[in-house]
């Protein structure tokens, strides 16, 4: 989830727009319904009776960083296209194609079914999820119990990833922007009326761009959940086994509400609050990220004051807040609050920012080139190896300052076509469409500006982004989500880290309270977002036992988190 756009996941694959949707609309649908009790009465036989044509996967669709994984399991990895209705309420209006990737069970004779993955977002392309997890499981160490169990999961389950509708290469939701975006600075550190107004106008422009694309109306969680049920039916499985991370927990919950009798083993990893609106609850990220800063990052720096010389946690906090706005923006807008293995780097970047501030104050006329030269002779930390690491991060901050990026334009979710027109890519557009279409949002622009003001006051290093709310300008009726009572007794397993910055523990606890049949494993002293497989026996053995034998842990159980970091600068 990107720092400047709370709740927005950062997918790495974006397809090409074109006539694919128009061509798909020429295909009519017919047949019989798949589930009279939980689905509207429309014909789906054409979809449920299709045969998947599994072929070798195209490496360019998986991503260059995943090609090695593709080569590691060549005989078991195949890709296919699943045909689904554009609109489940009117299936004759058109067809979409959903990309699939399967890592087949190594021992098909003892196959227990398929496990479908969703990595989150919304807007994350999940095609490679199966490849990543299939590789992790297949190559887990046989020297310990949890590794042996992960290998057994690889042997007995097909692992399936898919590109949710709106993502992938076949029918991407790409929205053409009329005009340009206004220059927008950080909503945390520039609270001027002009900047806030620019942010609101940009949010309105984003919403209007996608409302002009007819595909947007069909991008929502209910449709994706029904796509997953078609996948289950085409695979020939009586029930859906599922692992969802972050937004994937919301998707899994919606699927379960639609098809409670179809739920097999379901793991909700890093949970949203399924009792609240989707779009409204992302404001909790500000609270959770500030908590990571105050309760984990700053105390870590204090514990290593001998190597970092940053003083006490309170002294460091005050020094960071006193930084000039431009430097605070460069520091905190690229702070990772979802990967606790990067704790050391986060604290070293704080040291770099403070050292750079000292250089800028002592050399007020220095340009970026001069600052880069000054960094080479500046003592950032008393330990030589730490000083080298901090100096490198100071150079990165100087580059960020030189970029002075418009916060409304991010290179990974926007592109410029040959004529210079802006286009919003699926990483952003699917996120926006799902959040706006699913359950709408509370209040109007003035309401969210008030929330933003409150968040900045409470969380001065990370709060305020709720001033920019595209869903306020999205006049589309939200979906009707089935009641939670339909799944209250389902034996769903949840996994959560205590300090999760993207989906706070409070959200998971609210979901657990609403699901009496669910069980939750809480990983302590940890802010990793997305845990399984975690790499400890306490976590992985309990999850594997659930999928392999259906064994559930107690209602509330806990596991020790992995050590957050070693010696600073090591």
Positions of the model-derived regions?
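N-terminal secretory signal peptides that target proteins for export/translocation
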Residues: 1-11
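General helical structural elements
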Residues: 7, 14-16, 106
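Bacterial N-terminal signal peptides
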Residues: 17-26
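Bacterial signal peptide processing site
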Residues: 30-33
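Gly/Pro-rich cap/lid or specificity-loop segments adjacent to the active site
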Residues: 35-353, 428-570
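Alpha/beta-hydrolase-fold enzymes
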Residues: 301-425
